[in-house]
Amino acid sequence: MEQVTLRRALGRSGIEVSAMGLGCWAIGGGVVWEDGTEFGWGKIDDSDSIAAIRRGLDCGVTLFDTADSYGAGHSEQILGKALGKDRDSVVIATKFGWTFADDGSRRSYGSNASPEYVRSACQASLRRLGTDHIDLYQLHIGDLEMAAADAVADVLDELLAKGDIRAYCWSTDDVSRGARWLGRPGFTAIQHNLNVLEDSPEMLALCERENLASINRNPLAMGFLSGKYTKDSRVSPGDFRASGIEWVAVFDENGAPRAEWLAKLDAVREILTSNGRTLVQGALAWIWGRSEKTVPIPGVKTAAQAEENAGAMQHGPLTPEQIAEIDGLLGR
C-alpha cells in the first residue's frame, strides 16, 4: 500500500505525529481483577500483535498509544519489542494510575495517583518499553479529584525537567478536568472519547481554543464501526464488551450490539463509505473532519486492521458538508 501520512501537531508541544495513532490496549491481553474476573478483548497472539505494530509503521503511523495497565504491563513490553530500532522515529504515549502486579500474574488492583507512585510507575514504564524517555505521559484516572490532579501535575513537571517525559496529558471525558492544567507548559493534550456516533463538542472546543491535541480513544466505538456486527452478532468469549459495564454503551450484557446503535450506523453508512472508503476509514475521516486538533487512536490486533486503518490517511477528512449531513441524520 502506498504510504500517505497526514500529519498533526501534538498540541503545543512542538511534537508532530501522524494524523492517526495505533491503540495498543487489545494487544496487552487480559487482566484479572481482585474478584477473579478476567477482563480483556479476548484471545491475542503476540506475534500477530508485533506484526500489527510493524505494519502500522510501514504504513506511516508514528504515534503509538498504550498504558502500563494494559495486560498488566504486557502491552508496553510488546510495543517496545516491536518498535526496536525504530523507537526514535516514533512517538510513544503511555498512561499511569491503575495498579497491578508486575510479576506476570496479570492481577489488576485499584487506582493510585500518589506522587511516589507516579514516579515509580514512570520508571517501570521506561523499563518495559526499553526506552529512556516517554514522549507523552498520560494520567489514566479520568475522575481524579482536582487537588490530587494538581499534585500529579507537579510530579509530571518534575519528570519533564529530568527528561523522563517530553509532554503530558490527562485521559478524561470531563471538560472541567481537561481544563485544569491549562497553565502548565508541559500540558499538551487531552485524551477523550470521540466517534461519529458519540460527538464531544465541548471537549473539542476546549482543545481548539487552547491549542491542545484531542487524542481520540474509542474512534471505532469499540469495534462496532468495523461494520462486522449485526443484530445476530456476539463478541467472542472472554471479551469485556459482554461484561455489562456501564461505559460499554454499544453492546449489551450478552455481547450483542444494541438495536439503536445499529439504526444510527445504518443512517450514516452511505456517507462514511463514500469515495472508496471502507466503513472504518469513513469513521476516521469523520473525526479528522470534525477538528484539525483530532488524532484518533483505533486499536488493532492484526496487521490487516492496522493497514485498513492507516489507509484512511490516503482519503483524508470528510468535507464540512458531509459532517453537517451526518449531524442532521443523527439529529444533533
Residue spans for each PLM region:
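Beta/alpha (TIM)-barrel catalytic core signal, keyed to glycine-rich beta->alpha loops juxtaposed to Asp/Glu
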Residues: 7, 142-332
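Short, acidic/polar
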Residues: 43-56, 113-129, 173-180
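Active-site groove signature of glycoside hydrolases
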Residues: 126-145
